[in-house]
Amino acid sequence: MKNKKKKLIVILYTEEKTKLNYAMGMIATAAALERPTELFFTGKSVKSLIINNKNSNFNYKNSEELLLAIIDLNTKLTVCSGALSDNNIKEKDLRSDIIINIEGL
């Protein structure tokens, strides 16, 4: 039988730590229930995905653990190409240890 569950896409615009954790918590719950999921980073949230960013919000509480969990649960991570440009971030500046798709909104 074909999976008829609708995909949950959470668009994350802010780099606020608690909102990042909340978004990943929602995604993790849906993904654990075998619902297709995508976390779309735009606005200032793209800064969280920079390599060696000591100020990354993935250093907050269990954020890195949640990120790895949603990746293990097959969540698609997408970054807005316009947000990269607006924040003067190049594709090579993004973390290379995880698969990040770059697309337009």
What are these regions (language model features)?
Residues 19-39:
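Histidine-anchored nucleotide/phosphate-binding helix
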Residues 27, 64-68, 105:
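Short amphipathic alpha-helical segments and helix-helix/interface helices
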Residues 84-105:
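N-terminal glycine-rich phosphate/adenylate-binding segment common to multiple enzyme folds
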Residues 44-48:
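Short active-site-proximal "capping" loops at secondary-structure junctions
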Residues 8-21, 49-53:
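Short, glycine-rich nucleotide/cofactor-binding loops
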Residues 37-43, 77-81:
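Short internal beta-strands
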Residues 52-57, 94:
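Short glycine-enriched, charge-decorated loop/helix-capping segments at active-site entrances
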Residues 55-86:
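A glycine-rich helix N-cap at a beta->alpha junction
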